[in-house]
């Protein structure tokens, strides 16, 4: 009986195919990939059949065959009515107008819904079959310029979807581009912070690269080297501690914390301070140490420097054009054992003093 019934419906199939070819001329682009001649022809035939013959005709369609094998569901007429009611009963699917009756839209949605994948009703609207036009969109996104080629590759292996996946792709591409723009400054700051600790050099090599051009003498910076380190010194507050032939770099050190660290390190010879003032102090201050700004003491003692051990030597060095302050504290015969350098961001008036050793010679 089923064969005779199908033989009697051949003229309607031919008529539906002719109407389908006429509708194909009106469609410019099928972005959702729902255009399928077999499903469209059967859906058109179902639309022309009376309601009594719809259940018998739907039993022979591939969509219901896959539905019965997947979950053993009933006929297509009741479920298609539910989908039509859920979608609003119109011919518009997410802003894209589809030419044809409602059964075309419902048939394509139901065939994808009962193909074996469990999806919700909201997700089934975006689910379509693999169509050459959707593959063309994925190829365009994959071969696009710049950042389009980074996050499209893992998503290209998934089944293509409609506008929901394209919006999801654009959202991920915008976030990845924002991350790429923020990678640059953080990498530069990290390399600047780890420049001394990553090299692992020992001896006066690290000391000369950070503090002075000549590694044999401890003296102030030359004016030629201030231009190269101006940007590095003004961008961050760094403290470099040389101990045991290794350099340890610390970023964003507060001046008060640097004073405490330098006071603890110089407990045998007095306290050291990294702060600069516009006017030199006229009286001795026990908290900041018995030093005057811009002066250098080598051995012996004076009225202004009581209780100064003769073997200790302190040399503050100032850059004439840079905003950073560097002080080097060593002991005779122990130039390579330990030293502390503090770099600040404060812009103060530099003080220029001559070296007593150079004046004596």
From Swiss-Prot:
Pfam families: tify. Ubiquitinated. Targeted for degradation by the SCF(COI1) E3 ubiquitin ligase-proteasome pathway during jasmonate signaling. Residues 53-78, 113-134, 190-232, 268-361 are annotated as: Disordered. Residues 113-127, 208-232 have a biased composition (Polar residues). GO terms for cellular component: nucleus. Keywords: Jasmonic acid signaling pathway, Nucleus, Transcription, Transcription regulation, Ubl conjugation. It is found in: Nucleus. Residues 56-78 have a biased composition (Low complexity). Residues 232-267 form the Tify domain. The keyword Transmembrane helix does not apply. Signal peptide: none annotated. It comes from the Eukaryota. Residues 333-361 have a biased composition (Basic and acidic residues). PROSITE patterns: TIFY (PS51320). InterPro entries: TIFY/JAZ, Tify_dom. Repressor of jasmonate responses. Interacts with AFPH2/NINJA. Belongs to the TIFY/JAZ family. PANTHER family: PROTEIN TIFY 4A-RELATED-RELATED (PTHR33077), PROTEIN TIFY 8 (PTHR33077:SF8). This is Protein TIFY 8. It comes from Arabidopsis thaliana. The lineage of its organism: Eukaryota, Viridiplantae, Streptophyta, Embryophyta, Tracheophyta.
């Amino acid at each position: 009986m089923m064969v005779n019934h199908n033989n009697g419906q051949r003229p309607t199939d031919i008529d539906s195919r002719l109407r389908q070819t006429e509708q194909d001329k009106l469609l410019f682009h099928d972005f959702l990939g729902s255009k399928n001649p077999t499903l469209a022809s059967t859906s058109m035939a179902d639309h022309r059949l009376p309601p009594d013959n719809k259940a018998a005709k739907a039993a022979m369609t591939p969509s219901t065959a896959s539905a019965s094998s997947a979950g053993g569901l009933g006929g297509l007429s009741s479920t298609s009515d539910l989908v039509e009611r859920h979608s609003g009963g119109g011919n518009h699917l997410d802003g894209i107008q589809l030419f044809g009756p409602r059964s075309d839209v419902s048939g394509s949605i139901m065939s994808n819904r009962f193909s074996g994948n469990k999806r919700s009703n909201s997700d089934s609207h975006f689910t379509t079959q693999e169509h050459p036009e959707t593959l063309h969109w994925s190829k365009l996104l994959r071969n696009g310029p710049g950042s389009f080629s980074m996050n499209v590759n893992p998503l290209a292996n998934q089944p293509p979807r409609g506008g929901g996946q394209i919006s999801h792709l654009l959202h991920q591409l915008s976030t990845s581009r924002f991350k790429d723009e923020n990678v640059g400054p953080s990498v530069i700051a990290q390399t600047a912070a780890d420049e001394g600790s990553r090299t692992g050099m020992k001896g006066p090599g690290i000391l000369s690269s950070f503090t002075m051009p000549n590694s044999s003498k401890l003296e102030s910076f030359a004016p030629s080297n201030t231009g190269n380190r101006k940007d590095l010194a003004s961008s961050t507050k760094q403290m470099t501690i040389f101990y045991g032939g290794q350099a340890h770099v610390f970023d964003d050190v507060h001046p008060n914390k640097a004073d405490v660290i330098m006071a603890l390190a110089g407990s045998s010879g007095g306290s050291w301070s990294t702060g600069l003032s516009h006017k030199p102090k006229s009286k001795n201050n026990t908290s900041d140490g018995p030093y005057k700004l811009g002066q250098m003491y080598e051995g012996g003692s004076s009225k202004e420097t009581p209780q100064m051990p003769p073997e200790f030597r302190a040399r503050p060095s100032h850059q004439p054009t840079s905003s950073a302050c560097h002080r080097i504290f060593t002991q005779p015969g122990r130039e390579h054992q330990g030293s502390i350098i503090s770099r600040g961001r404060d812009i103060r008036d530099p003080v220029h003093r001559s070296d007593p050793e150079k004046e004596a010679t």
